[in-house]
């Protein structure tokens, strides 16, 4: 696969006949570029495609173009009128179309972005703020999934969602699962490039820890698999973040065993019920040391009106087993929570996906909702940040955190426990380095609606909360999760040679010492920095 054969050229007559049947050229500089790109695509692929279903421009039909652009973009903050828009959008329907896209973009010197599910926190998969003009390669039509229960594996294309993958696994077996994220609308292509954690992480590690093979298009338009790309590049794409080394076409993943019966629960406590922080402090002490089968997160939200606002803590758990065994574990290790049999709900693994996703639970939607690529929280404007705690946060620190939370109405903080399998995998196994010694990960999240008159006030607040937490989290470097991308940490400037110096700071936040190896691999496989964005891995300075 490493040495792709030259693709046959379609005759000029057939190219232009097909082209003009779907597209009318307007003599402007932008459409001239579109014209050149389309003709180049046809010359470099032998798999036909129709322009009206794959190629979208504001000149042809502005409303359809906008609909396609916004279709999977999850952060509305990057769809405002002032944000740059792609000159056109191309939706490949075959892997050779992706190869041709790379070849033609390189030949015509077109900067592009690649989107699978549109969940990038800072929108870099569909917006370029540093290089304009740009175009968008949207992989949403590449979503085939082939599950092989006998081989305990599956091939899944980059445009498929996590929800679709889970559904197709459950369709074949009730005893198999996969340890990826909890939100069903996540695009599998980009999700795994950042590591990808979920409710099975303490038992089986990350999604990226369970990748067996991959197909990728490199900077020369070649189609590579694990054998032809080599182990260095295969290492880099499993957690080194997307948009740096090539375009992921598909992953071969390892399925993991799950029991026929899982148990889930939610126990909610208000600040008034845990004013001394006895329960929360105990969670900090034991959450990463519980049995590997138990995954117990804490969600902090603000409830009540102005006169009666309080912080609510929802302890949301999943146990790989029946509720009787879970009750024994909780009575032994975390009696302070007060879990009861009534709190526990037994269900299948696929039903637990619906439960953990945040969809309504009374009644829950049918599992077919996983095929609809719907986000349970909808599409909102938001800003997110992340941290890693290496030790329990003292009561004084918790008091200050709660005080900051009460300043807002739509604030969300999530604590995710580590330990288990995460402790057993070395930091350098893949680029994702947050392993042994991590008690829990923290996500800070603030959303708002399009009617918000002062969005800058919301982003200012989350930055203040992040600043307040500084003494209580990791340092030197202050670690961050790359799938919760945060441009506050720093960003590249155009295609500048100075990017490496500045990137060492945010690179250490995301990857610790693994950043240096990522840069060496990037410099080898993409020396011209063809694949780039605001936080892509830079090349070594010449």
Curated annotation (Swiss-Prot):
GO cellular-component term (any): extracellular region
Major localization class: secreted
One example GO MF annotation: oxidoreductase activity
Record: glycosylation sites: 61, 308, 436
Pfam families found in the cross-reference section: BBE, FAD_binding_4
Residues annotated as signal peptide: 1-30
InterPro entries: BBE, FAD-bd_PCMH, FAD-bd_PCMH-like_sf, FAD-bd_PCMH_sub1, FAD-bd_PCMH_sub2, Oxid_FAD_bind_N
Residues in FAD-binding PCMH-type domain copies: 82-258
First-tier enzyme category under EC: oxidoreductase
UniProt keyword annotations, A-Z: Cell wall, Disulfide bond, FAD, Flavoprotein, Glycoprotein, Nucleotide-binding, Oxidoreductase, Secreted, Signal
Pros-8alpha-FAD histidine modified-residue sites: 119
Disulfide bonds: 40-104
Top-level taxon of origin: Eukaryota
Enzyme Commission number(s): 1.1.1.-
Cofactor(s) the record lists: FAD
Location(s) in or outside the cell: Secreted, Cell wall
Family, similarity comment: Belongs to the oxygen-dependent FAD-linked oxidoreductase family.
Protein name: Berberine bridge enzyme-like 25
Organism: Arabidopsis thaliana
Source lineage: Eukaryota, Viridiplantae, Streptophyta, Embryophyta, Tracheophyta
């Amino acid at each position: 696969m490493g040495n792709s054969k030259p693709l046959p050229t379609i005759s000029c007559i057939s190219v232009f006949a097909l082209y003009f049947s779907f597209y009318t050229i307007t003599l402007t500089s932008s459409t001239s570029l579109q014209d050149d790109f389309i003709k180049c695509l046809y010359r470099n692929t032998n798999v036909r495609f129709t322009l009206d279903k794959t190629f979208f421009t504001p000149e042809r039909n502005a409303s359809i173009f906008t609909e396609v652009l916004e279709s999977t973009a999850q952060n509305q903050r990057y769809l405002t009128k002032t944000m740059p828009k792609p000159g056109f959008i191309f939706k490949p329907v075959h892997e050779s179309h992706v190869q041709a896209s790379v070849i033609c973009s390189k030949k015509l010197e077109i900067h592009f972005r690649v989107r699978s599910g549109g969940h990038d926190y800072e929108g870099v998969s569909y917006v370029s703020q540093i290089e304009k003009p740009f175009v968008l390669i949207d992989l949403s039509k590449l979503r085939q999934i082939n599950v092989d229960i006998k081989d305990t594996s599956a091939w899944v294309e980059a445009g498929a969602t996590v929800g679709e993958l889970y559904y197709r696994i459950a369709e074949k077996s009730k005893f198999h699962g996969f340890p990826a994220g909890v939100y069903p609308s996540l695009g599998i292509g980009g999700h795994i490039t950042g590591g990808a954690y979920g409710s099975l992480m303490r038992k089986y590690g990350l999604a990226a820890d369970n990748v067996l093979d991959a197909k990728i298009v490199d900077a020369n338009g070649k189609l590579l698999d694990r054998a032809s790309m080599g182990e260095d590049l295969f290492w880099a794409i499993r957690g080194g973040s997307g948009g740096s080394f090539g375009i992921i076409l598909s992953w071969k993943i390892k399925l993991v065993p799950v029991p026929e019966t899982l148990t889930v629960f939610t126990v909610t406590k208000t600040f008034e019920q845990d004013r001394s922080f006895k329960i929360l402090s105990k969670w900090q002490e034991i959450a990463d040391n519980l049995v590997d089968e138990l995954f117990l997160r804490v969600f902090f939200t603000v409830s009540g009106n102005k006169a009666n606002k309080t912080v609510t803590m929802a302890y949301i758990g999943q146990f790989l087993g029946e509720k009787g065994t879970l009750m024994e574990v909780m009575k032994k290790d975390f009696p302070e929570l007060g879990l009861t049999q009534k709190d526990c709900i037994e269900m299948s693994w696929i039903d637990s996906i619906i439960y953990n996703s945040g969809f309504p639970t009374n009644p829950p939607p049918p599992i077919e909702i996983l095929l609809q690529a719907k986000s349970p929280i909808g599409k909102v404007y938001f800003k997110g940040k992340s941290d890693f705690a290496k030790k329990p946060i003292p009561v004084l620190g918790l008091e200050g955190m709660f005080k900051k939370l009460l300043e807002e109405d739509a604030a969300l903080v999530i604590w995710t426990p580590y330990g288990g399998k995460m402790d057993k995998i070395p930091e350098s196994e893949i680029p994702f380095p947050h392993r042994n010694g991590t008690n829990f990960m923290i996500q800070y999240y603030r959303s708002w609606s399009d009617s918000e008159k002062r969005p800058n006030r919301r982003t200012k607040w989350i930055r203040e909360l992040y600043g307040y937490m500084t003494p209580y989290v990791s340092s030197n470097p202050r670690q961050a999760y790359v799938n919760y991308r945060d441009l506050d940490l720093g960003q590249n400037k155009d295609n500048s040679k100075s990017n490496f110096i500045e990137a060492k700071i945010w690179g250490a936040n995301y990857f610790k010492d693994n950043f240096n190896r990522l840069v060496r691999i990037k410099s080898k496989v993409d020396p011209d920095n063809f694949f780039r964005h605001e936080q892509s891995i830079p090349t070594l300075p010449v």
